[in-house]
Amino acid sequence: MPRIIFPFESAHVHLAVEGSTGGTTLGLHMAADAIRDGGRVLWASPDMPDGVRFGQLFEHLSLADSSKFHAMNLVGNLSQAVDVLVETSTALPSVRLVVLDDWCAHSGRIPIDRINDMSKLASSLGDDISLLLISKAGINAGDSQSDLTVRGKEKMQQAGFQIWTLTRKQDGPKRTVTINDEIIECRIDDEGFVAR
């Protein structure tokens, strides 16, 4: 099955993920695509991606290409991390994607200062650099058709972010990626996200 190519070029994306369904994997999948297309990736998260999973998703890239993945530990003051990411995105040539994985708490409202930091980051990046924010979605306790809630959705949209979701309807490899209102049914495997 062919790997899915997600439309993230020059986009600012807030990806809300149902717990443990592959949000980091989706970010790595998109990172590998950005590198394959000649770009560099800046990755920031509290924990570095699993080395085995990284190897699987980057297996089709050369070792030289894999070195275009630049990771930093996202701990402490988010405003300072934003400044470092902006500075690095201009210092390194051909940065095409900046990813912040687990950039906010796993539950509750996303504080407005965090959203403001992400808005500042988005507006400070060059027009040819995409931004992907990965966070856990909330659980919907209301009458909505969806089981999850995109935390900070309205504020993120006001800041110019597209809203994507990643869900799993049942155990197993089948996943659903929703990009704005477009639904992509896919399967997760060693290579990343593939059509099903």
Show where each model-derived region lies.
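Structural motif
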Residues: 61-64, 90, 155-156
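P-loop NTPase motor core
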Residues: 93-159
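A short, basic N-terminal segment
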Residues: 1-11, 194-196
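Conserved P-loop
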Residues: 8-84
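Conserved alpha-helical scaffold flanking the Walker A/P-loop in AAA+ ATPase domains
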Residues: 2-5, 82-94
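Phosphate-binding/switch region of NTP-binding enzymes
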Residues: 129-196
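Conserved nucleotide-binding/hydrolysis micro-motifs of P-loop NTPases
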Residues: 47-50, 75-78, 104-105, 137-141, ...
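Residue-level signal for alpha-helix termini/capping positions
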Residues: 32-36, 90, 123-126
